[in-house]
Amino acid sequence: MLKEAVAYYHELLEDHDLAVESFRVLQEGHEKNRLIFGGRPLSPYLRPHFITAENWSMVQDKCRLIWSALQKVKDAAVLDDELLDELGVTEIEKDLVKIDPGYKQVSPTARLDSFLTGEAYSFVELNGESPAGIAYSDSATEIFRSLPVMQKFEERYALESLEGRPKMLEVLLTCWDEFCGGKAERKPLIAIVDLKGLPTQKEFELFRDYFQSQGCDAVICSPEELEFDGGKLYLGSVAIDVVYKRLLVNEYLPIMNKAPALLDAYRAGAICMVNSFRGKLVHKKAIFAVLTSECYSHLFDKTEIDAINAHIPWTRKFREEKTRRADTPVRMSAEHERFFAATGDADRSVRSPGEIELVEWTRTNSHKLVLKPNDDYGGHGIYIGWNSTAEEWEAAIETALANGDYLVQER
């Protein structure tokens, strides 16, 4: 059905007048709906992304399983310095992630980046710190639902919009209630906190206006503007209850000493901060190396392991070492196999993985590998093997080894 629906949408755009009018509405909608990133329109084309209800249900099911596994990694990591080291958590970050945020979820608002094709559904990485795009997506939805071409399309096909801001507010209020011991008696004042002058300013405004429309006072501020009196966190005379933290840890660390109020209030348990600093645990790209390593398979149950095998690309920290690799994935240690056998759950197929020299294997398998930094974003520092010459790939390997905090990941 999806192919037929997309073909019909393209057919509608062959109507010149309909396409021109739809494009006009799209262009005008960007400014009106604040679908602007750094001064430029975010979605300037008349091409939405359609997904079937069946596929959407599948995506939700798989995400729930993967998220369950990620939560278990967090639970283990806060008690295990060796696992923190494997994730690439620095000493100062270790101090931050060991502070209890007052709620259980490791990253209440996160984005699992993935590819969905007719053949497979595969995750690429996880933004577990402070993902952008939630409110922007709402704006794009509002604009596209108003297009003449979309209204014509809906005469034949039923559409369901995905709403982000209501769910984001629900997450903040749920964390706030848990933070209050399940006895929150009022709606919190929410501060959206990030550095000044960022291209996502319009999205902050979209969130602020929505929160206010739902009865939650909200402000936008930078960490430098905050003050902590030992009991409450303030923006001027305004007392803050919940911090919707869009500020990245890597951007806060350099200014933490001159803008300590946010950390001091968080450490004192004076604010509910979402996401907490513990989001850094799953934001590290090495989280996929932990998920796909047999060394940590004892953390997960069978359904989680099966989901990891099917949807998480094989990933390793890039270093001089021997590791296991074979054509058919498996994530269970011998101890885990014995456990499943003892519980009558030994029917899953398992292979005996082969051992490889990781660096040399990476050198000879560039056609299916990428090298990426453990803790960066926006595509910085990524080397794509299948787009590289032998010389370029060798240089990438040397760069990654010298850096010491890179991942190698299968395509």
Give the ranges of each region predicted by the language model.
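Preference for protein termini
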Residues: 1-411
